[in-house]
Amino acid sequence: MKTFLQGLAAPRGRTGFQVLAAGLIGLTVLTQRASAADRFLPAAPEAGVEIPPATIKFGMRPYADNTFYIIGMKKGWFTDVGISFDPAPYGLKANDSNVTTLLLNGQLDLISEFCPLMLPTYKDAAKLKCIGFTDNFLANAILANPALKLKTFKEYIADGLGFEAALKATLAPMKGKTLVGAPQLSDRAFEEYINKTSGAGFKLEVLDDAKSLVLAKAGREDFVNPEGAPIVYTLRQAGWTNLVDIGDLIKYGPGGVESPIEPLIGIVGLGANSDYVNAHQNTILRFMSVVWRIIDATKADPSLYELQAPYLNSFAGTNLDGKGVEATVNILHPFTTFDANKQYYDDKASTVYYANVWSAIIKDFEAHGIIPAGKIAPDDVVWGGPIWHQLVDYRTKTDELMTKLKGMTLASDKQALADKAKIFYAGYDFLDAYRLALAASN
């Protein structure tokens, strides 16, 4: 009995070779389409000047840089671009234990996320994508009970010690001791690197942040590495010693693409189901525009964090006011503005350039057997670049139209469209700014 491939090879005449060639061409086209289907596919702007309404099944995780979206919700900025949330009014309170499942099965379309947490799903599926970055996470830190009165990495550096010598001296008191860390896999690379490089040989005990915080406040822990920045901030405010953090490693450790520090760099953002993204491309652009509007607004007016604090406290186990949230953001995960996103997508020499960071993360996950080796590339996961670049392109096109409109005498209805376009432009909704400016110019 012939195999399928033998059957393909059997014909000898011209017709047979034509069939074979056609089959191979068809296979190539299908392969190209399959490849294209696993990338962000931009949509054309909608006709007309109205913004179509959209409801997003959205979830937030219990961290300061994962709940700032609540500011835009309370201010009505998502409503301005036609977006509402399911469940109303603020979406779902999610956590790291259920977020990937909720995204995969379609119970959520979009989630605030540390995107490497989605990578383990690539062993079986390639549905979850990182559609944007919001901040560089600097909260990975080894904190010590203040009663121990230990010297920090920064102090050893100030004394003149080199990187590895300072790290060994800092963590020497941890030799044979226990570090209480969070369950998230994203923390393991940081913990493993400092343990190996310092030679401390500490043991890891995994515990949820909320439980760890209770024990720390009771003085029943000596060394902790919480996942959540609000927990890190709360303990630092309570006097816990920041022995060494990820910022120290980035600043003083070895640099370059092959640096062992590269897999430790954490960039927080948004995860989404690719089926939703490529069926609602313009909704994604509008959502992201509000994200950058919030970031810009909080930098100009930090009192906006008062809107976020109660929501964050309600499921993070913290007791922060607006100033506490502001300090958490500024110290542990400063937000990235729209224009500063070029460091992720355009600046190949940047420490946080997505291809460098994600190549290192993927390599680390492969080494741990979490995902298959050689099957996944950064562009398979990170779709934020094409999305950001599309908004940059809409801004450029809108600038050109606005320049054209300045030299025109407009009817009142056209002038109203031009004025509204400026409002959308100021709120980073360059898609609708372009649509309205185009309508005004015609």
Q: Where are the predicted features?
A:
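Short, solvent-exposed loop/beta-turn-alpha elements that line the ligand-binding surface or hinge
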Residues: 150-161, 251, 256-259, 338-351
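Secondary-structure end/capping motifs
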Residues: 280-375
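Short, glycine-/small- and polar/acidic-enriched structural segments
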Residues: 38-208, 220-229, 242-250, 424, ...
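Conserved C-terminal helix/tail region of periplasmic/extracytoplasmic solute-binding proteins
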Residues: 358-442
